[in-house]
Regions:
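Flexible glycine/acidic-rich beta-alpha junction loops that bind and position SAM and/or redox cofactors
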Residues: 48, 99, 153-158, 187-199, ...
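Glycine-rich beta-alpha loop elements in corrinoid/cobalamin-binding modules
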Residues: 1-9, 234
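Catalytic cores of alpha/beta
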Residues: 194-211
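Radical SAM [4Fe-4S] cluster-binding motif and immediate context
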Residues: 15-183, 189-193, 199
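Radical SAM enzyme core and accessory elements
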Residues: 236-346
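Short helix-capping segments at alpha-helix termini
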Residues: 109-113, 214-219
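Glycine-rich beta-alpha junction loops
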Residues: 2-4, 44, 230
Length: 346
């Protein structure tokens, strides 16, 4: 395999040149992390081969990160010149190296900047308590993790490095609570199974598991995706979705059709094993969950709006009556524009 580019061998990013053509201030957006949040990439790739991930065919389990010193140099420059007060790391996997994370955190201790990144539960769970405490003191406010499912057999089928388990997902949510770092868990519902009854059972199992996680750590952010197949040829999951009747587009023109554009935007899974009733069940649960636990990343919601949403969602959430939550959808549409991190990002 070809070695990934050594970013440390490159000159410093030309922020001033960019500012000449498109003001840097326009890149610094308001998020729950701060008023001027910088989006930054500190590494390339990911060393893992999850069978549902589109990154795998691109990087083929390769990862290479910029040094902590050079990351800090760039951030410090943008902070001093344009007033950046927080950072979103959009790496596919920021936390591959505990050593690099610790070195970066030590440099950030005096900067008073909140930051967010993406990682793996089974990687960060190997970090020492001292490292996690340091990260929080250095401004680490939230970490995005692909929890995916609480079912160990499905996790194995997804090839989550062979290490992540449902029990670990629950335990890790509690561990993050101890260090006041918000775990942002994404789940993928609607995976293929041998029968419609098994698909239904897995959806209900995942819903119950998500509720368990919220009981363990109510601060856990939950993002739900309906499974959209990815062409990761050679994986067990790839073979299974083909056997279940799913067909990928054959040409570039097919991929550009409105049908597949909707698929790419996660609006329509197009999977033959998922019925409209199944998709509706997932979406209705997501609506109720988001009402009961409004995302902390939505800075536009007032305290009153949050309380009203929580009140509307509470009864449905605790009784399991998720179907047809029209009152919640009407509230979200006409009284507030509820933010969706799963499609809008941070």
């Amino acid at each position: 395999k070809e070695t990934l580019l050594d970013q440390d061998a490159l000159p410093q990013l030309p922020f001033d040149e960019l500012d000449r053509f498109y003001p840097m201030q326009h890149y610094l957006n308001r998020t729950f992390l701060g008023k001027k949040t910088l989006a930054y990439h500190s590494s390339m790739g990911c060393p893992f081969k999850c069978s549902f991930c589109a990154v795998v065919p691109i990087y083929e389990a390769r990862w290479r990160g910029k040094s902590a010193a050079n990351i800090y140099r760039d951030i410090k420059y943008v902070q001093e010149k344009w007033g950046a007060d927080s950072i979103e790391f959009h790496d596919n996997n920021f936390f591959v190296s505990e050593k690099r994370t610790v070195e970066f955190s030590e440099l950030m201790l005096r900067e008073n900047m909140n930051w967010w990144g993406e990682g793996r539960i089974d990687t960060v769970d190997q970090y020492s308590d001292e490292s996690l405490a340091l990260m929080r003191r250095a401004g680490c406010r939230m970490i995005f993790f692909g929890a995916e499912t609480g079912n160990d057999a499905l996790l194995k089928q997804m090839d989550k490095g062979g290490k992540q388990t449902g029990e670990q997902i629950r335990r890790f949510a509690a561990r993050m609570k101890k260090f006041d770092i918000i775990p942002e868990y994404s789940f993928v519902l609607g995976m293929p199974a041998d029968s419609p009854e098994q698909v239904w059972a897995q959806i209900e199992e995942d819903i119950a598991f998500i509720k368990q996680v919220k009981t363990i750590n109510p601060e856990t952010e939950i993002i739900i995706y309906v499974y959209s197949p990815v062409p990761t040829e050679g994986s067990e999951l790839y073979e299974r979705i083909l056997q279940a009747g799913f067909k990928f587009p054959a040409t570039l023109e097919d991929w550009l059709s409105p049908q597949w554009e909707s698929f790419d935007l996660r609006r329509n899974p197009l999977t033959p094993w998922l019925t409209p009733a199944m998709v509706r069940r997932i979406r209705d649960f997501e609506t109720v969950l988001n009402a009961r636990f409004p995302t902390v990343s939505d800075t536009k919601l007032s305290d009153l709006q949050r309380r009203v949403m929580q009140a509307l969602g509470s009864l449905r959430y605790h009784t399991g009556i998720f179907s047809f939550p029209y009152e919640i959808k009407a509230l979200q549409k006409f009284w507030l524009r509820y933010r969706q991190p799963e499609t809008e990002g941070m």
